[in-house]
Amino acid sequence: MRLEGKTAFITGAGSGLGRAASERFAEEGATIVAADVDTDGLEATADRVADLGGEVTTHELDVRDGDAFRAAVDAAAEEFGLDVLLNNAGVSHDRMDFEAIDDDVRDRVLDVNVKGVWNGCQAVLPHFKEQGSGAIVNTASLAGVIGAPQLTGYSLSKGAVVNFTRALAAEVGPDGVRVNAVCPGVTDTPMPRKGQSDEEWAQRKEELARHYPLKRLGEPEDVANAMLFLASDEADWITGQALVIDGGFSCA
């Protein structure tokens, strides 16, 4: 199995991509340290990992809190060792014109999406450097590569994650640490369907899929498989990359 004997710390694990990654990593042998502010979602993820036969522990964690992030990582490293960090927790904002985005909305998006990634990397790097190995996978977005009109705050945050990933990869590569990012297009997770009924979302998915050469939106498993690859030893000579997973949208 591709992550046999490894431990992965996964933020935003209570739903969506984080839950899919927790399940996929567990299927490949990883011990899962699942973190999220959503304790109900965490419990559901833990149950699903356990049903797969995986070992899992949970931490209620707001990634904006650097001290809490370090404490959770230190505890995981002491109990299990630590090999992979998946910085996946993230938020967006409603589509609106740039001038309508107020400071509170902007700050929340930047604090979770940028400071959260920063805090996670600062928490794990002492452990990774000491052992001379480790893989960090940051969840960015296609919006961080090509930009998304009326999602300028979100685009700003994810663009920062992409360039931060490249800079940090160059810095810590000599320490044996790899840092990569995934940049998904629209994926069927709670974030893009927020505020929509099942019927409304089904119609919206059909409309959006027309713009993708592969004629469908992404599923969480599509992104989780890419995360798994970048976290595994199969990607041992890959670092500083922002892997676009978008069904061909950006080339159409």
Predicted features and spans:
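Conserved glycine-rich cofactor-binding loop
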Residues: 7, 14-15
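Short C-terminal tail/terminal secondary-structure segment
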Residues: 92-95, 146, 210, 228, ...
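Substrate-binding pocket helix/loop in short-chain dehydrogenase/reductase
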Residues: 96-98, 102-110, 208
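Active-site helix of classical SDR
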Residues: 121, 157, 165
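Alpha-helical segment proximal to the catalytic Tyr-Lys
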Residues: 126, 170-174, 236
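Residue(s) in the substrate-gating loop at a strand-loop-helix junction
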Residues: 141
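C-terminal helical subdomain
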Residues: 181, 202-234, 238, 247
